[in-house]
Amino acid sequence: FCSSASVYGVEYSSDPKKEDFLLKPVTRYASNKADAEAFFVEAHKKDKFPITILRPSLTYGPKLGMYRQISTDPSWIDRIRKGKPILICDDGSARCQFLHVDDAAYIFVSLLGKEECFGEVYNVVHKKPYTWKEYHIEAMNVIGKKVELIEVSFKDLSKFKIPRFGLCQDYTSHDAY
């Protein structure tokens, strides 16, 4: 079952989160994933249902494009290309992990049908976490253009009540892996 690292919620600051941590989801998406996990775990315990639960981190690939800390809007790449500054939440020190879809697919396929993995839960994350500031700087390096990163407090971002900033509230303003 494909769950999500978002089931851990935002309270943990442990580096990294472990599979046996208590689930504390804060979004409907994460709550639904946690509920599904509980259903499958119970089915495994009761009836030996053959389930392996995988919790991938922020997964990206050719269809989704590049994440951004404060929204899913891809215009930030264009802003960098044009030399315009971009916003980051707080000081950009919240950590995140990214997982390419090809790596996720490899892991998923490699576990298919492995009886020794039934009833187990695995975090599926990249081995190195990045801060959002490091991530944005790396994107600038790839594009070949440096722009100013404007730090805006989460509190100030929240005042605008812009729906696309919900990602920041629910996930990316916290250590998210």
Regions found by a protein language model. Name each.
Residues 2-15, 28, 59-63:
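Conserved catalytic-site region of short-chain dehydrogenase/reductase
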Residues 13, 24-53:
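Active-site Tyr-X1-5-Lys
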Residues 28-32, 56, 69, 100:
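The catalytic Tyr-centered alpha-helix of NAD(P)H-dependent dehydrogenases
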Residues 52-72:
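Flexible, glycine-rich beta-alpha linker
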Residues 59, 75-89, 145-150:
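A short C-terminal helix-loop "cap" of Rossmann-like NAD(P)-dependent dehydrogenase/epimerase domains
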Residues 68-76, 82, 89-112, 119-120:
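Substrate-positioning beta->alpha
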Residues 82, 110-170:
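Mid/C-terminal beta-alpha module of Rossmann-like enzyme folds, strongest
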Residues 99-102, 130, 174:
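Residue-level signal for the nucleotide or nucleotide-sugar donor/cofactor binding architecture
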